[in-house]
Regions:
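A structural signal for short loop-to-beta-strand junctions that line the ligand-binding cleft
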Residues: 18-25, 29-34, 53-85, 97-98, ...
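Hinge/capping helix and adjacent helix->loop/strand transition within the periplasmic-binding protein
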Residues: 91-108
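Early extracytoplasmic/lumenal segment of secretory-pathway proteins
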Residues: 1-44, 194
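Ligand-binding pocket segment of bilobal, Venus flytrap-like solute-binding proteins
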Residues: 130-228
Length: 243
C-alpha cells in the first residue's frame, strides 16, 4: 500500500497551462503532477513544448505487452460529461434541446475557440445518429416553436447537401448555427456554475461540466436547489449534453 501527503490547487479560468509553463522554467519546479481534461490543449501547450511527460505504471505496461518507455500517449483517467442546466428560480422551462437555441435565449458556454472539445461536440451533431435526434426533438415541438426554427432549417438545407450530410443534416446545421450565434461566451465552466446557482440568475441556462456542482457551497443566495439538469426532467427531448 502507498501513503502520500500532498498539497493541491485548482487554477481558475484556464490558467493551468500558463502556471505549468512558468513552473517548468524554474530550476526546481513546484508541481509534481497535474490532471487536465482538455486533450487538445495538453497536446499543443504541454506535450509539444516538452513541458509534460506521461506517467505509465510499470505493472500496467507489462500487463499490456509494452514498457513505460515504449508507450506513447497519455492514460485517460476519467470521462467528464457536459450537460445542459438551467436556473429554476423563475418560470422558464427547458424541455427540449431546441429550447436552448430559442429566441432570446443565450446559454452560458465556454468559448469553442478556447476549448476545442466544445467545437468537436458541434461537429459531432452532424453525424447521422445525432442529427436524427435533433430532427426527432424538433418534431416534438409545438407549432409556434417549429415556425420559428423552420426558416433556419430551410436555409441550411443547401449547406447540408454541399457537405454531404445525411437526410437530417439541415437540422444539425440549424441548431449549430443558432447555438454559435447566441451563446454567452465564458472563460471557464466554474464561473458558469457559480452564476447559475445564484438566486439572481433567474431562467438563465448553460452547458457545463456536471461535476462542477460538487464545488457549490450553500449560502445566502446560492444553492444547488436553484439549478436543474435539463435531461433529468420528465419528458425532456433531444440532446442532453455530451461526454
Amino acid at each position: 500500500s502507498y501513503k502520500r501527503e500532498y498539497e493541491w490547487q485548482q487554477p481558475k479560468n484556464n490558467k493551468i497551462f500558463e502556471q505549468l509553463t512558468a513552473d517548468s522554467l524554474k530550476t526546481e519546479g513546484t508541481f509534481a503532477m497535474t490532471l487536465i481534461q482538455d486533450g487538445n490543449q495538453i497536446e499543443s501547450k504541454m506535450v509539444q513544448p516538452g513541458i509534460l511527460k506521461t506517467y505509465i505504471p510499470k505493472e500496467w505496461a507489462e500487463a499490456n505487452g509494452t514498457t513505460p518507455d515504449a508507450y506513447k500517449g497519455f492514460l485517460p483517467l476519467q470521462t467528464l460529461n457536459k450537460v445542459f442546466m438551467y436556473n429554476s428560480t423563475g418560470s422558464a422551462e427547458y424541455k427540449n434541446c431546441w429550447d436552448f437555441v430559442a429566441e432570446g435565449v443565450h446559454p452560458l458556454y465556454m468559448d469553442i475557440d478556447s476549448e476545442i472539445v466544445g467545437k468537436n461536440f458541434l461537429y459531432m451533431l452532424t453525424e447521422d445518429k445525432y442529427a436524427g435526434w435533433l430532427k426527432d426533438a424538433y418534431d416534438a415541438l409545438d407549432d409556434t416553436k417549429k415556425a420559428y426554427f423552420k426558416p433556419v432549417i430551410d436555409e441550411m438545407a443547401t449547406d447540408a447537401e454541399d457537405l454531404g450530410l445525411g437526410e437530417n443534416g439541415a437540422y444539425a446545421l440549424a441548431w449549430i448555427k443558432l447555438w454559435v450565434e447566441n451563446y454567452n461566451e465564458q472563460t471557464d465552466d466554474g464561473p458558469i456554475c457559480n452564476t447559475l446557482v445564484t438566486d439572481s440568475a433567474t431562467d438563465q441556462a448553460g452547458l457545463l461540466v456536471y461535476s462542477k456542482l460538487r464545488s457549490v457551497e450553500e449560502s445566502a443566495g446560492v444553492s444547488l436547489n436553484n439549478i436543474k439538469v435539463a435531461a433529468y426532467q420528465d419528458g425532456y427531448k433531444g440532446i442532453g449534453g455530451y461526454g
